[in-house]
A protein has these predicted regions:
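Generic hydrophobic segment detector
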Residues: 7, 74, 78, 116-117
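Conserved beta-strand hairpin/beta-sheet module of binuclear metal-dependent hydrolase folds
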Residues: 1-46
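Short acidic loop-to-beta-strand element that houses the catalytic metal-binding Asp/Glu
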Residues: 14-16, 96, 116-117
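Active-site HxH/HxHxD metal-binding segment of metal-dependent hydrolases
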Residues: 25, 32-108
C-alpha cells in the first residue's frame, strides 16, 4: 500500500491510500475535491472509497464531487449519520471493516466531535 499526502485548503491534508497492485484507492478526509481530483486523474487512480473521520467541513468538503465523479462509497461513523450527507457505509467502534482491498479497525475517539473515529 502506498500513502499519498494531499494538501487541501490552507492548512489541512487528505490522505490517499492506494493499492499498488490495481490502483484502487480510498481517500481520507477530502477537505476539498480539486487537489484530490487532480492527483487521482494525473495518476490514473480508481477511487473506491471516501473515509471521513468526522463531520467538519474541512474534512468532508470534497465528498460530493468525488462521490459523484467516481461513484465512490462514503464511510463514516454511525454517530455522524445526521451530519455527513450520503454516507453509504456506517462504521461503529470496534468494528473490523474490510473488502477485497482494504481492512481496518474502527476506533471511536470522541472529544473533538462525538462521531470522531
Amino acid at each position: 500500500m502506498k500513502i499519498e499526502i494531499i494538501k487541501c485548503l490552507e492548512d489541512n491534508f487528505s490522505y490517499l491510500l492506494i493499492n499498488e497492485k490495481n490502483s484502487d484507492a480510498c481517500v481520507v478526509d477530502p477537505g476539498e475535491s480539486k487537489p484530490v481530483l487532480k492527483f487521482i486523474e494525473d495518476n490514473k487512480i480508481n477511487l473506491k472509497y471516501i473515509l471521513n473521520t468526522h463531520h467538519h467541513g474541512d474534512h468532508i468538503g470534497g465528498n460530493n464531487i468525488l462521490k459523484n465523479k467516481f461513484n465512490a462509497k462514503i464511510l463514516a461513523s454511525e454517530n455522524d449519520r445526521e451530519r455527513i450527507p450520503e454516507i453509504d457505509i456506517f462504521l461503529s467502534d470496534g468494528q473490523i471493516w474490510k473488502d477485497d482491498i482494504f481492512e481496518f479497525k474502527v476506533i471511536s475517539v470522541p472529544g473533538h466531535t462525538m462521531g470522531h473515529i
